[in-house]
Structures are given as C-alpha cells and as structure tokens.
Amino acid sequence: KKILEKIKKRYEEIIDGLDLNLNLDHEFDKIEENFLAKAGRDYAASRGEYLNGLVMAEYLGYEFIDPAEVIFFDEHGVFEPETTNKELAERLEHVERAVIPGFYGSKHDGSVKTFSRGGSDVTGSIVAKAVHADIYENWTDVSGFLVTDPRIVKDPEVISTITYRELRELSYMGATVLHEGSIFPLRQEGIPIHVLNTNAPQDPGTMIVENTCSKPKSTTFPPAQTAFKI
C-alpha cells in the first residue's frame, strides 16, 4: 500500500504539472483490490502502461482504449490474431484518434496477458493492420537499423531501406531494434514500417518494405562461430 501511495503521488504530480482534469483515485483503488486478489505478474507489469495511457489520452484529448478489451490470448497465453483483428477493426471503425497502451491484452477469463519484451511493437503493428494503415511508424531509441554491429565497427551507417525478408534475417543474427512478432501482421497487409528515433526525430530512420532493388545493406558476424572449408 505504501508503494502504491508513492506511485499515486507521482502521477498526481504529473497530472498537476500538465494541468489536467483527471482523477486516478478509482484506478488506484482497483489496482490495490486486484493486487490483494493476487491478480498476477502480468497484471502488475501492465499497470504503468495502463495509467500512462490514461494520462496521455487526457492530455491529447483522444479516446482511451484498454488493450484488455480488444487484444486477446487463448487460455494457454497464445495470441489470437483473427479475434483481435475483428474486435479492433470494429472498435476503431468510428474512432478518429485513440490512445491504446502497448504490450498487453487479456485471456478469455479476463486476466491480463503480456507479450514478450518489446511487445509494444507488436501492439502497434496489430492496430496498424486493423485500421489498414498506409504506414506504421515505430518510434524507438535508435535511428534505425545499422549496416553492422556498432560494437565491432565504429559509427556504422544507418540502413535507409530494408525488406521484410532482410529484416527477418537480421533478427536471427541478433538485431533487436524491432520485435520480430510485429513483422508478420504488417507484411500480410503490405504495410511499410518506418523506424524512427524519439530522441532524434529529425533523423530519417529506416523504412521496411516488401521489395527493394538496392544493393546488399549489412554485414553480420555471429560471435562464437567458426567456418571450415573442405
């Protein structure tokens, strides 16, 4: 309870600083009640994202949509793309702007289920597919994909354009800019991805598309591997 009070106070400071007409007392009461009822680790992990979404929606004047109401997993925790896409498309059909927090949804029993680390990328791609977006902008903390590992080569160039297939190969080699689970929903619909840097919005980033005719773009070197020619 003391920890929740500290968190609540911090949110109140943020709300006051933004001069918002938002009261989260009821939300914190629900969170405490669910914690006492042993709601689980995924529920706890998702509450910051949920509360941030409420604040952001109020600040922007957009509708807030709880992912637990529109993103679904089965009883084994496996994501259900068809059910989710149908529900999301119907929910967003008449919504011009909305804030949808990332990385979690719910199982059939109502319990919260999270995606793996980086799951907000997946949430964004799911929403982009549901609304048939022209492009999916993924804002992160880097300026796109690099031509090689910066731990090996100093100041490598950023790849301006890359294909879905090339991206998948890079992910197998350890590239972690984008959650690999975010690729499939967008590739199905032919929606390009633009990876951009939140901390450097002027940077052009990397565009991910279905096809490109440009030359090879990157060099990878998996550690602890040896090749023999016989």
Description of each model-found segment:
Residues T206-I230:
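A conserved regulatory-domain signal marking ACT and ACT-like small-molecule sensing domains
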Residues H179, G190-N197:
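Acidic/polar loop patches that form or flank catalytic/metal-binding clefts of enzymes
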Residues N34, R151, G190, V209-E210:
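Short amphipathic alpha-helical patches
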Residues L186:
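Acidic-aromatic/histidine active-site loop/patch
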Residues K1-L178, I183:
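Nucleotide/pyrophosphate-binding catalytic subdomain
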Residues L146, V195-C213:
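Terminal amphipathic helices with adjacent charged low-complexity linkers/tails
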